[in-house]
Amino acid sequence: MSNYYYYYGGGRYDWLKTVEPTNFLKIGLPYQAHPLHLQHQATTTPPSILEKFKRADILLNEVKAEMDPLMLQPETEKKLYQILGSIDMFKGLRKKVEFTYNAQIVTNAWLKMYELLNTMNFNNTSQAFCNCELPGGFISAINHFNYTMMHYPTFNWVASSLYPSSETDALEDHYGLYQCNPDNWLMQSPLLKKNVDYNDGDVTIASNVKNLALRATQRLTPIHLYTADGGINVGHDYNKQEELNLKLHFGQALTGLLSLSKGGNMILKHYTLNHAFTLSLICVFSHFFEELYITKPTSSRPTNSETYIVGKNRLRLFTPKEEQILLKRLEFFNDTPLVDLSLYQNLLESIYFAVETIHLKQQIEFLNFGMKCYRHFYNKIKLLNEYLAPKKKIFQDRWRVLNKLYVLEKKHKLKLCAPQGSVA
């Protein structure tokens, strides 16, 4: 944990001193050398294996539930989000990064990806496939890192996302990255539905996943880095966030495992890690990467459940049988485990340590802190911001130093053409 605390002298707000900003959390998982046996059909998992994960889910949801009544009224919901925004240590950092370092599309996703790249020490970032990618924060961060830190002469990329339309919750092309770089994108407009190989980027569809992986490898070989930042909007139902995203997260992972080259690295977004299917998916990953980690960047808000699974140095590709089984499971999806979890006791212990560290300790601590701030600063948000401003500056300056930011030369900037009415 960081040595930087909130200090505001004595008085009624001394309790603000008790919360400290987070450090990058990284929990290593053991490689599994034994053969991978994928389950063709559902089998019963002994309850004892999942018991503590279920308890962890209950404990976290009990804390989250304190906020549920506030979500029911527009006024209290607005105040809650204002408070949570005030305790976000990275609020305001995006503009500083954009203007100081000539960076592009500096979203929260940009900060997280840059931090992941800098902390995880990847050996190659020059050729990347970024999935579930719009509006483009990951690509922009990789581009910036590639040229300013890795000093490669080129950055080659392909990307995909659920095609933005009024009929879906897909993120839009706010910055014109898709509009100005159509040849880099793998998904297609609904206007092309008549095409035999039409693909709208929906990774919950097995045929799309297989097709996206094929397109990616045809356009870019080798693929050194695969990223996926998919997440379904669950409204206010955060207690079911992991469950509602199971199929999406399986699809984005499968796309990566079908396309990532040997020796490549992978970064996948997840939320809580308590569901038996999620645990089994991590078990599958452990057969393919020399190093596997569950991470929580400091720029990922500590009040949310977001995690990133990182695989380093892919050791082998799928066998035809493994590919067939996993694609069939996605096509006829059910959430039973992909493997026999009883064979992975040591790995599950490491995963639980990550759950305990990220969710049961850090997230619960910050959720409780957020609720306490809500009670004390409901009508004094300006005062809360004044209290936190000095330490935000210290922490943001520290983050910029730790993550070694440098100015991106103009010649290396991505081509953007933000459409009318965008947020660029």
UniProtKB/Swiss-Prot annotation:
What SUPFAM superfamilies does the entry give?
S-adenosyl-L-methionine-dependent methyltransferases
Task: Quote the record's binding site residues for S-adenosyl-L-methionine.
Answer: 136, 229
Origin species, per record, is: African swine fever virus (strain Badajoz 1971 Vero-adapted) (Ba71V)
Mind telling me which Gene3D superfamilies this protein's record contains?
A: 3.40.50.12760
Recorded GO molecular functions are:
mRNA (nucleoside-2'-O-)-methyltransferase activity
Q: What UniProt keywords apply to this chain's record, in alphabetical order?
A: Early protein, Methyltransferase, S-adenosyl-L-methionine, Transferase, Virion
Q: Which GO terms describe its cellular component?
A: virion component
Q: What is the designated name of this protein?
A: Probable methyltransferase EP424R
Q: Which residues form the Adrift-type SAM-dependent 2'-O-MTase domain?
A: 104-316
Q: Which residues form the active site?
A: 269 (proton acceptor)
Q: Which PROSITE patterns match?
A: SAM_MT_ADRIFT
Induction details: Expressed in the early phase of the viral replicative cycle.
The places in or outside the cell where this protein is found are: Virion
Write down the EC number.
Answer: 2.1.1.-
Q: What is its main location?
A: virion
Q: Which InterPro entries match?
A: Adrift-typ_MeTrfase, mRNA_Cap_2O-Ribose_MeTrfase, RNA_MeTrfase_FtsJ_dom, SAM-dependent_MTases_sf
Which GO biological process annotations does it have? 7-methylguanosine mRNA capping; methylation
